[in-house]
């Protein structure tokens, strides 16, 4: 996921209301952020899995990599991370900024449900501290702010780091057309890093296309 690095170097996807990409994705700051990524990629400091075919964390990390970006579920799936020398750390800052991406699943009660009361009780149960702490063991971060200071989180060398990083996390563009927007982003990245397209022009074109998905 390139978004965190793009944000880290000062890039912006849209306005705060997620209504327009033109003027944001193709702003001077965003173009500078992309050029920084190009510079790091050319120096082989930064790799892009879908561009370089580089291995991801699930296929095995070796000493070739100093850092990789992965969600908390990675540590919930592998008990031997520490033995391999893999430890959780916040993303390095750049000009005082750090960045990450936040996502998740939804739980809802449908207005057409025949068992609204039971469904509501189930939703309350799933969002209770008891269940959220249990899900933490599987690598799912709790959704409750009340658990940030819980000892199970604070005293854990993995979960405490991820909760700290959440302070600078941003959401992907919340749109029913998100799949199309992701495709536009991917095509832009491919054109820049594989085909050698001019970053400014590629970002301008992508911004216009994303505008069409946001309208």
Residue ranges of model-derived segments:
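Extracytoplasmic/periplasmic substrate-recognition and gating elements
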Residues: 43-46, 79-140, 190, 194-197
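Glycine-centered hinge/linker elements that transmit conformational signals in sensory
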Residues: 19-50
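Beta->alpha turn/N-cap motifs
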Residues: 54, 69-75, 105
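Short, well-structured alpha-helical segments that form the helix of a local strand-helix-strand
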Residues: 199-211
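Long, aromatic- and glycine/proline-rich binding clefts that accommodate carbohydrate-like moieties
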Residues: 89, 136-187, 191
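Extracytoplasmic/periplasmic solute-binding protein
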Residues: 1-23, 65
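Short helix-initiation/N-cap motifs at beta->coil->alpha
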Residues: 48-59
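Paired acidic/hydrophobic, glycine-rich loop segments that form the ligand-binding mouth/hinge
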Residues: 66-71, 87
């Amino acid at each position: 996921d390139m978004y965190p690095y793009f944000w880290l170097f000062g890039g912006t996807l849209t306005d705060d209301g997620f209504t327009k990409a033109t003027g944001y994705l193709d702003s001077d700051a965003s173009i500078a952020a992309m050029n920084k990524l190009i510079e790091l990629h050319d120096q082989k400091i930064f790799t892009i899995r879908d561009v370089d075919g580089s291995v991801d964390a699930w296929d095995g990390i070796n000493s070739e990599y100093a850092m990789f970006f992965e969600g908390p579920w990675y540590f919930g799936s592998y008990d031997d991370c520490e033995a391999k020398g893999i430890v959780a750390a916040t993303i390095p800052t750049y000009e005082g900024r750090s960045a990450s991406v936040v996502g998740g699943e939804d739980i809802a009660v449908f207005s057409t449900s025949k068992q609204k009361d039971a469904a509501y009780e189930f939703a309350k149960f799933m969002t209770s501290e008891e269940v959220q702490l249990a899900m933490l063991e599987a690598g799912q971060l709790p959704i409750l702010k009340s658990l940030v200071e819980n000892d199970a989180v604070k005293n854990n060398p993995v979960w405490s780091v991820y909760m700290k990083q959440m302070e600078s996390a941003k959401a992907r563009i919340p749109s029913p057309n998100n799949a199309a927007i992701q495709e536009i982003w991917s095509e832009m990245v491919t054109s820049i890093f594989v085909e050698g397209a001019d970053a400014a022009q590629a970002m301008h074109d992508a911004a216009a296309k994303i505008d069409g998905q946001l309208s």
